[in-house]
């Protein structure tokens, strides 16, 4: 409450399980005026399920958006004046929904009437308001244009570059998978452009492309991670039910095991091929990430997160977010649905230009400016 201004408010969404209606959603509203948080009941999850939405982008289609607005925003809107700043913290299913992107009946977006700011937790509001100039060493590690198919000899050569003997991240034998991950052609160009933007500002940048972006290279950042970590690669997230169809993931039920990132050479492990001795598989789960110390990293950017396998669920998105938070990362920027390589690349270049050219290290302002530019 102390971090809010007069024209600002916080919506902290929550959920609970009812014996009669299953999972239900509610929202705590906090502003500068009220002495205590206001609790508003919203809807049962089965009401959203009944709409027949099977992909996150469908929330914003005309046939569904109005029903979503009635369930999610109509019970809340009386508490916010137009033009005010509304911070919000999602919960469960709501991780899939961007409030500002919901279309209104008149064709405008909800975000054109309010300034929405999405947070990973209410605590993030306090940190954000500090808005200090970042005095960390300007270092960045960029992954993109990765080669997911590699010969065993190439995998061995890349693995030899890193000594991971002190890293306690032991995993069992790889089991069989099925489909493969395709090259993200625009991601290499994206990394080259972002590297150029950062180097113009005298940043120390290391880029991993092609065969170089291995799991070994990622784990080697443990306890010596960069200020910025940019990952333009495939991500995957599965529900426990869907995971049963993927041999690689069978037997796992928690979101931290069913979500992750694919690095160089990852197809071999995903397909269940025998890996050379001393070589890691290139499939980095959220659990693997959570075990690392990435405390030096102020921001992780996942710019191609949904372009891989499976359905982007709230649990899956939350799995990756939680993993990087547990590893000590300050801010996570990630996509909720697929965007073309060209648009993604243009947005990322604009985002980094806005970020490094500002007098203050303000990630959220840079993000908003980049959206307007692209």
Name each region found by the language model.
Residues 1-55, 59-374:
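Catalytic cores of enzymes
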């Amino acid at each position: 409450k102390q971090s809010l201004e007069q024209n600002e408010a916080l919506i902290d969404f929550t959920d609970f399980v009812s014996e009669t209606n299953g999972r239900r959603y509610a929202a705590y509203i906090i502003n500068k005026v009220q002495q205590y948080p206001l609790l508003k009941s919203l809807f049962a999850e089965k009401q959203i399920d009944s709409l027949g939405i099977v992909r996150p982008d469908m929330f914003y289609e005309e046939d569904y958006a109005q029903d979503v607005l009635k369930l999610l925003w109509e019970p809340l809107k009386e508490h916010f004046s137009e033009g005010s700043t509304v911070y919000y913290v999602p919960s469960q299913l709501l991780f899939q929904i961007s409030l500002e992107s919901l279309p209104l009946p008149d064709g405008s977006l909800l975000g054109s009437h309010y300034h929405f700011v999405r947070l990973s937790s209410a605590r993030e509001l306090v940190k954000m308001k500090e808005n200090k100039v970042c005095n960390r060493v300007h270092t960045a590690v960029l992954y993109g244009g990765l080669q997911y198919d590699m010969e065993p000899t190439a995998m061995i050569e890349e693995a030899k570059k890193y000594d991971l003997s002190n890293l306690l991240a032991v995993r069992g034998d790889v089991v069989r998978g099925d489909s493969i991950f395709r090259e993200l052609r625009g991601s290499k160009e994206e990394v080259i452009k972002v590297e150029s933007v950062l180097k113009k500002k005298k940043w120390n940048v290391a880029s991993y492309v092609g065969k170089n972006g291995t799991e070994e290279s990622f784990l080697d950042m443990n306890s010596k991670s960069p200020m910025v970590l940019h990952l333009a690669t495939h991500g995957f997230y599965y529900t426990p039910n869907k995971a049963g169809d993927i041999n690689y993931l069978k037997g796992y039920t928690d979101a931290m095991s069913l979500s992750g990132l694919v690095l160089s050479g990852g197809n071999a492990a995903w397909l269940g091929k025998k890996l050379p001795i001393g070589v890691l598989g290139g499939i980095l789960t959220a659990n693997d990430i959570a075990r690392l110390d990435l405390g030096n990293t102020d921001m992780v950017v996942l710019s191609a997160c949904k372009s891989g396998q499976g359905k982007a669920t709230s649990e899956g998105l939350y799995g990756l977010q939680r993993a990087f938070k547990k590893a000590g990362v300050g801010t996570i920027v990630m996509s909720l649905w697929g965007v073309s390589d060209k648009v993604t690349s243009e947005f990322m270049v604009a985002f980094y230009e806005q970020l490094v050219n500002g007098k203050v290290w303000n990630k959220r302002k840079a993000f908003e400016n980049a959206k307007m530019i692209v």
